[in-house]
Each structure stands twice: as structure tokens, then as C-alpha cells.
Amino acid sequence: MTQLPDDTVTRPRRRIVRGAGLELAVYERGIPDADTLVLVHGITDTHRVWDEVARMLADGFRVVTYDVRGHGRSAAPGRTDGYRLTRLADDLYAVIDAVSPDRPVHLAGHGWGAIQVWEAIYDGRANTRIASATALGAPSLDHLGMSLRQPRFPHTRWWKLPGLGWLVLGRRLLRWPRLRARPIPLTRTWPADLAAGGRIVAANLVHHLRNPRERRTAVPVQLIVDRADAAAVPAVDAHVRRGVDRLWCYRLPADHWLPITEPLLVVEAIANFIDDLRADNSPIEYSSR
């Protein structure tokens, strides 16, 4: 990608897609007949976190972003259990079916968006609907839960923490400097986005860490690990490898807000990964220099 994409290609076109019982705000840009790439944002963000990445990818892909339920212009469920990962995955498949009903799509997710992508690729529908997946900085909660149960954590017992313990742990995590240094402007929907993010965590984190599942996918997966990311958990590596038939691992010297702070690195990683799949189906492991 040596040229900047044309503005008519990069300007997003908004549409409404019916998700799992509610309406989702979906944004498309890029070349209509190109391979479709769906980008999934994390908690307390909106589709705007992908703006720069989507703009640069639009000259080679049909790029789709959307506001996860409860965020941005998408509707919110009335109950916390409406934020279960199974519902978020159903939303993602609704978007996929709406924008690319006849061809599989490529996925990429950041933070809790990556966790949603993991949930989607472990679903049976992935065999025909998902061509590849890129997870930025996050394993699945099942990977994390399995790793915390290993003998190397004999005294941790994270999955047995009482409700108050999880609250204290969550507050400590939110005080970590790298997680607090959020380099994106606040939107008018930010209070609602924050509340929705909290409900996603409440609906899923404890449940999946206490009840992790051994799962496997044939979808080619690229896991991008941010070397300087305080939220990255290297101990899950072995569990990721056991759950993925074809895994690529890409380590970057960047931080948690990779789509904002280093969008070009993200663009190159995603585009090169898809090109590698077209040329060679054997998994590799590589790092940036």
C-alpha cells in the first residue's frame, strides 16, 4: 500500500443491521467487491477506534466496522446477561451475514474486541463464514482461565475470588498507568460506552475464568502481542497454541492502544497476514525488528 486511498473509498457509509435482538450501527468503506475485513472494537470504545486503520486498509479491502451493543449508536440490551459473549458473537455473525452473505470474511479485534473474535472463531459457523482472524493483544477468556489453573499458580486461585475480590482486582487493573493512558478523545456516548463496557466484563470475566472450556478452531489466527502492553498475559501462550490449528504470532514493540498509537503497524500486520495466507498455508512465527 504505497498510495493514500481516495477519499470516496475511505469515507464510511452507515447502515443498520439487526443483531441478536437489537439494532447495530455498521459502517462500510473501501472497495465493494474486494475481500471483506470486519474490525471489532473493545469495551468503552466505539467503531471510531479503528478509523485510521480502516482508512488505510480501504484501498485494498472492503472494511467494515460497527458499534458493539451498548456502545456508540448501537442499541443496548436491558439486562447484563444480554452482554454474554455468545450474544456478542451472534451480533458479529449478523454483521457478517449482512455485509458478505456469500463469501467468508477476515476478522480483526482489539482488546475485548479480540475476545469477541475468539468467541466467534470457536463457533461452528466459523468453518464457512470466517477466512482468518487477527487478535490484537488478547487471548480468549478460556485460554486465560486455563492458564490460571496451572500448577505454576498454586496460590492464586483467581477463579475462586468472591465478588468483592473481583471488584478490588478490577479497580487495581484500571489504575495501571498503561490502561489509564487512553489516547483517544471522548465521544458524546462515552458515559453509556463506559457502562456497557462494565456490563460486558461483569457478564463474562468471572464466568469464563471460573469455567474455562477446551476449544479448537481451524480458522487461521494471527495473535499480535504488544511487548509493552500491561494487559498482555504471556502465560496463556501454550493454551492458545493448543486451541488453534494454524497460528501466526506477531510481537510488536508497542502499547495497548495499538490501533491509535501505531495504526500503520496494525495495517501492515493484517494485510501481510492475509497475503501470507494466500501464498502459503503453513503457520509461521515472526517478530518485528
What are these regions (language model features)?
Residues M1-Q3, S288:
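N-terminal targeting or regulatory segments adjacent to alpha/beta-hydrolase or S9 domains
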